[in-house]
Amino acid sequence: MPKKVFQQEDVEQKITENFEPKQEFEQDELDIEMDCSQFETTMDRQNTDIPFQHMVRPKVTMWQKLLMATICLFSCGILAQSVQWLVDSWRDNQWIAFVFAMVSLFLVLLGLGTIIKEWRRLVQLKKRLILQEKSREIRSKSAVNLTEVSSEGKELCLKIASLMGIDDKSPQLIAWQEQVHEAYTEQEILRLFSQNVLIPFDRVAKKLISKNAVESALIVAVSPLAIVDMFFIAWRNIRLINQLAKLYGIELGYVSRLRLLRMVFVNMAFAGAAEVIQDLGLEWLSQDITAKLSARVAQGIGVGILTARLGIKAMEFCRPIAVAPEEKLRLSHIQTELLGTLKTTLFSANKVKEKVR
């Protein structure tokens, strides 16, 4: 192996090339701002939401089919027995038994009517989710398919307007119909419908979500009873989902409400709501804000963020057209108002108490 000779000057030159001149920072010049958009964009790119088709069309197992068949046979048997009891009581002149038979038949019919009503509301919810799936398919079409002009997008929008109960003479709907041109693609028609017809509904929904998030945070931050907070926040979250569903024209029954709640909570858990809260908590910690806040205020912030996350997911499920990335409501849109309201309300109250003392 040939001998290599190194010069001291060459070694020092290579070492100095790997170093950069030092930079000094003053504490006053550091300004850390909370920005959730980068984290949320990363989560969106990861595509953490549960595949939509699994929620819209879940697989029905054999046990579920057997259970539904058993319930149907049992309901038919109860109805037939009630009618038979009514006929026998009338024929035998047993008037007391006849009254009981009438009451039982009324209760059976009431129960069957409730079941049919719940089933219709479930079908309505499923139709809304299927419309969302169709809008997603239209938006995901390739550029080759977009060149084919089709009336499918316009028919879908008119069907959505009918399901939402929007009047044909509505100014927003008329403005959308005037802007639609034959040369427009399905994606452009959906975008115009969303901008002209659905944006007013989205604004009301965003106000509801922001209002409920701030109020929930204040309630938890002020209230000393954890059990009362738990039930009260649960009631307010269910009420928020009902308001959003009613806003977008969905009539929820007991079963359909449970199903919507299940889809929202499962999607929240899968999307990593805890990671969002952890990220926001680290940002607040970097600003040294948590040192000024009490434990109750920190809990209020966490509850407010969870309420906002719940409202955002419920809005995405209730909206008839899938939310586009530029239309999506983010936590960063709510956290500024949430933190500002808490600081203004609680810190001003503490200052008033100190002045009184």
Curated annotation (Swiss-Prot):
Keywords: Cell inner membrane, Cell membrane, Membrane, Transmembrane, Transmembrane helix. Its main location: membrane. GO terms for cellular component: plasma membrane. The keyword Transmembrane applies. Belongs to the UPF0283 family. It is found in: Cell inner membrane. It is a multi-pass membrane protein. It comes from the Bacteria. It holds the Pfam family DUF697. This is UPF0283 membrane protein HSM_0945. The lineage of its organism: Bacteria, Pseudomonadati, Pseudomonadota, Gammaproteobacteria, Pasteurellales. It comes from Histophilus somni (strain 2336) (Haemophilus somnus). The chain crosses the membrane at residues 67-87, 96-116, 213-233.
